[in-house]
Design a protein with these regions (language model features):
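C-terminal lobe/tail of nucleotide-utilizing enzymes
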Residues: 1-6, 174-256
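Walker A/P-loop phosphate-binding motif and the immediately C-terminal alpha-helix
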Residues: 4-45
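Active-site signature of alpha/beta-hydrolase-fold catalytic machinery across serine-
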Residues: 26, 30, 52, 139
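Active-site catalytic microenvironments for nucleophilic, acid-base chemistry
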Residues: 30-34, 116, 167-170, 248, ...
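Conserved catalytic-core segment of NTP-binding enzymes
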Residues: 34, 39, 119-120, 124-214
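P-loop/Walker-type NTP enzyme "switch/lid" segment
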Residues: 37, 43-123, 224
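Short, hinge-like loop/turn segments at secondary-structure boundaries
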Residues: 55-60, 167-168, 198-200, 227-230
Length: 256
């Protein structure tokens, strides 16, 4: 089966509550505005992404479709600005355990499903993975062209960063390694502690590959109502940050 030709961006995090799904939603809209054909794929059994896109809770998803050996294309839903959304969907505990067992045995599971979507080289897939070390994370890392580690400027994210770096190390050592970025999300420049923590991140990682997204309640408010956060015409540092990050992700992975 031919490999997926689309660029694949995996959003990962060492700990939860960092705004990873929110960021996946916003990046999907932003990259679509740049002319990419974007598919936002939820690879997380928590099944929360439908809330951000204003989709019904019973939207069919990849969990049950995969167990029934059904293709993913027909369950894609319209998202913001013309992008497509493929949610995980509702699953019970037994279904989740069955799927995780399957994924452990078949590391090419995700690659095969992406290949069947028939995406072009102008397409981008944004994968929202669960926090921490899990089978969904490793499936995404097998196919990723870029890996975005999402963190907050706090001690919990800094503590989880070392574990995530260890998890990523084998994938980043491959000949065709993905490019890795760290996005510090929801930075509050009015907080001296947050700025101090950002400095610690910079000392740990260096400037290269470290990006910042400022805190903006308008982003969360828009998503709470199922609205595109980038449709807001008001001046927003966070929206400017996201547009800039979309430009970064739209550039060739080996670009400086």
């Amino acid at each position: 089966m031919p490999a997926c030709r689309a660029q694949v961006v995996a959003l990962v995090s060492g700990n939860g509550g960092v705004g990873r799904s929110t960021l996946a939603t916003a990046l999907g809209s932003g990259l679509q505005r740049l002319g990419r054909a974007v598919t936002v794929l939820e690879l997380d059994p928590q099944n929360a992404l439908h809330l951000h896109f204003g989709l019904p809770h019973d939207t069919p998803g990849i969990g049950r479709a995969s167990l029934c050996k059904q293709p993913w294309g027909p369950i894609a839903q319209p998202g913001f600005c013309g992008c497509r959304v493929v949610v995980f969907g509702e699953t019970d505990l037994q279904q989740q355990e069955d799927l995780q067992r399957w994924l452990k045995q078949d590391p090419q599971w995700l690659a095969q499903h992406l290949s069947r979507l028939g995406l072009s080289e102008q397409a981008t897939v944004i994968i929202d993975t669960p926090a921490g070390n899990n089978v969904y994370l490793h499936q995404a890392l097998h196919v990723a062209d870029r890996v975005v580690v999402v963190a907050l400027a706090d001690a919990a994210s800094l503590g989880a960063l070392e574990q995530m770096q260890r998890l990523l190390a084998p994938y980043l050592a491959r000949p065709s390694a993905p490019r890795c970025h760290v996005f510090v999300n929801q930075l509050d420049e009015g907080s001296a502690f947050s700025l101090d923590m950002l400095d610690v991140f910079k000392q740990r990682l260096g400037e290269d590959g470290l990006e910042v997204i400022h805190r903006d309640p308008q982003i969360s408010e828009a998503l709470a109502f199922g609205e595109d956060p980038l449709d807001n015409e008001a001046v927003s540092l966070a929206c400017d940050d996201i547009h800039g990050l979309c430009q970064l992700l739209d550039s060739p992975p080996n670009a400086p």
